[in-house]
Amino acid sequence: MKLMKLNRSNILIIIVSIFALWNLSWFLITSIKYHKFVEVVPKNEFGVHLLKKDDGYIYSIKKPGYLSFTGNLAISNDDDQESLIIWPLITGGYEYGFSIQKDRETYEFYVDDDDNMKPIDENDPAAIEKMEEYKLELEELLSKAKEMWQL
């Protein structure tokens, strides 16, 4: 009976230790990964990492939620019709998404490693048309993001 109690307490200690280690790992990984980003986009008076620069671009950061490793960086123009979302990957590198809001419609695209847009819905002719129309805006947002966050 005493051996059974000892085993239960050992199991509980192991479980608590694993959970504590997971929390510590999450905290260190996300803090280190996002440190260089939040340094250049500090929290505003509302506690949000948001910065509007004089050039009309708005930069924001969403750090990963508790025990999640997925956060994002975002940049949009002043009229907020075009936005670039950047997902820093834990393993290194980034994934990009581009969003256009025009005439009450939203068009979303993946951005590949060569900075080319690919519509999420490849069968949507309007999205393909917008993709061609907004190439310069994507290039400008990518350039601003790379300059701001040293990507």
Locate predicted features.
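N-terminal export/targeting and maturation segments
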Residues: 3-6, 19-94
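Hydrophobic H-region at the start of alpha-helical membrane spans
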Residues: 9-18
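Extracytoplasmic electrostatic interaction patches
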Residues: 56-151
